[in-house]
Structures are given as C-alpha cells and as structure tokens.
A protein has these predicted regions:
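Eukaryotic helix-grip
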Residues: 32-286
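Bacterial N-terminal signal peptides
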Residues: 14-26
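Short, charged low-complexity linear motifs
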Residues: 24-34
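N-terminal secretory signal peptides that target proteins for export/translocation
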Residues: 1-12
Length: 286
C-alpha cells in the first residue's frame, strides 16, 4: 500500500511538472495583445463588482465578506480566522446584460481574510500605507516600490512585481489608491492599476519594457480592495483582488486553466500571511 501511495505521488508530481512545462511553452511561444473589447469587458466586470461596495461600506453594512454569509458559516469562519487560518475564496460577479466570460482574456477574482491578534489599527495602518517599503515587506513578489504622489487619503505608487511559477516574469506597475473610513474601527482602501508593462528580460528587471498591453499577457490589470476592522482583540484584514490576464490557447483551456487560476490565489494567500507577520513583528518593536 505504501508503495502504491508513493508511486501515485511520483506520478502526480511528474504530471504537474509536465503541465507546467506545457503551459510555459504554450504561453511563451505566442505574444498576446490587449484588445479594446477585452478591456471594455473587464471594465464592465469591475463596475459591477464595485457596485456592491456602497452597501458594504454603510455603517450597518456587511463590511467583511464573511459578514454576509449565513450565520453559522460566518461564525465558523470567524473561528477559523481566530485560530490562525487564512481564508481565501473564489468570487464571480454577475454582469447585468452580459456573461462573465471576457473575450480573449481571463478574470481572476478572489477574496482573502486574515486575523492579526493583539494589534490595533494604529499598529497596522502605518505599515500598510508605507508604500516605499513594499519591496522590503512583500519579497519576493515585489522587488521595487516607491510612492509617486501623496495627498491626504490618495496615493499614486509604483511597484515592480516579480512572478515565478511556470516561468519568470517582471512587471512595472502603477496604481491609484484611495483610502476611506467607515468609522474609527473600520478603514478601507481601493487600489486600481493605472499602468502595467512587462519587462522584456526578467533577468534584467530594470531593463527595457514591452509596450503597455503587449508581451505575453501574464498580467494586464490588477485591482485590490482592502478592508481593515479592529475588533475581537485584533485586526481583521481582507483583500479582494480582481486581475486580468490573457486567455489560454484554444483547445488547452480545460487542461491549463486550473494551473493559471491557482497563481493569483497563492499570491493573495502569501500577501495576507506576509502582512500578518510584518504587523506582528513591527508591533513588538514599538
């Protein structure tokens, strides 16, 4: 039985390696161009997604994703978070008058939550708003970061992103970020990508870029919506991420799509875990 089990593990690993290799060859061998119809469909998806925020950000609204769940499921989710788990769920927004498919593109929509015990918003917010330190705090996914502009609750920032899964790729990205407050215990921020360009040679991250909207299509858009709530002796942190990438090659979507969709989920999980680690570490020093 042990032999059979180990053989299955070996076969699974070989199959996974083969699929990753196939995915790398398929995507690297063909360039992808962001088309107006793809952008328009993604923009409609974002508008439909953001339309529910008005209700969620009301003083009596379901501020966190789990607040809108049935009572028993919400209770269990809070318990899991207090026990140290990171919760990540796949979401899908229904776009009025249109399907959820994006022509020549894929939307990746996830929400994740983590609980940071023993801290306050006063401990947490200065760290997450220190965009100049993103490369230090979120390594290896962020390799350079700086604040471009800052006025009140509005920021413009630059992040150089490093992604390594089936291949290595580097992006120069810029975001417009707006911070708001529901009440003294609840804060939120919306981060909207305004520019994403793939670096031509990932081994030279400060090198020449591909024109915006060209390259391999690994990342065309990235919006993140953050919520912070102080209660239960700590801070609940939620991040909802909506990103746009190229679609899979015709005929291989059923095989490769699960591998591609796993990347943003893993990135979100890692970012939440890193944020918790950093906030806990820094709060002990203050």
């Amino acid at each position: 039985m042990i032999y059979i089990h180990m053989r299955r593990i070996h076969l699974f690993r070989n199959l996974t390696a083969f699929l990753l290799c196939l995915l790398s060859l398929c995507v690297r061998s063909s360039a992808a161009e962001l088309k107006p119809k793809t952008t328009a469909a993604f923009d409609r998806y974002v508008v439909a997604t953001e339309s529910r925020f008005t209700n969620e950000l009301r003083p009596d609204g379901p501020f966190l994703y789990i607040d809108a769940l049935p009572a028993e499921k919400a209770k269990n989710s809070y318990q899991q978070l207090k026990q140290g788990e990171i919760l990540v769920e796949k979401l899908e927004t229904k776009v009025p008058g249109a399907g959820s498919d994006i022509p020549d593109g894929m939307v990746h929509h996830w929400v994740g939550l983590v609980f940071i015990p023993g801290v306050t918003l006063a401990n947490t917010l200065p760290l997450v708003q220190d965009y100049n330190r993103r490369a230090e705090l979120y390594t290896p996914d962020v390799i350079a970061s700086r604040t471009l502009e800052h006025q009140g609750g509005d920021y413009k920032i630059f992040l150089r992103l490093h992604q390594k899964k089936f291949t290595t790729v580097v992006f120069n990205t810029e975001y417009a970020i707006h911070w708001g407050q529901v009440d003294p215990a609840r804060m939120f921020s919306n981060s909207i990508s305004t520019r994403i360009a793939e670096v031509k040679d990932a081994d030279k991250p400060e090198g020449e870029e591909n024109p915006v909207g060209t390259g391999h299509g690994y990342l065309w858009r990235l919006n993140t919506y953050w919520r912070f709530q102080e209660k239960d002796g700590g801070v609940y942190l939620q991040c909802e991420a909506v990103s746009l990438t190229r679609d899979m090659p015709i005929g291989l979507g059923w095989l490769l799509r699960p591998l591609v969709t796993a990347i943003p989920k893993a990135s979100l999980n890692r970012a939440l875990g890193q944020t918790r680690t950093v906030v806990l570490r820094e709060s002990k020093h203050n």
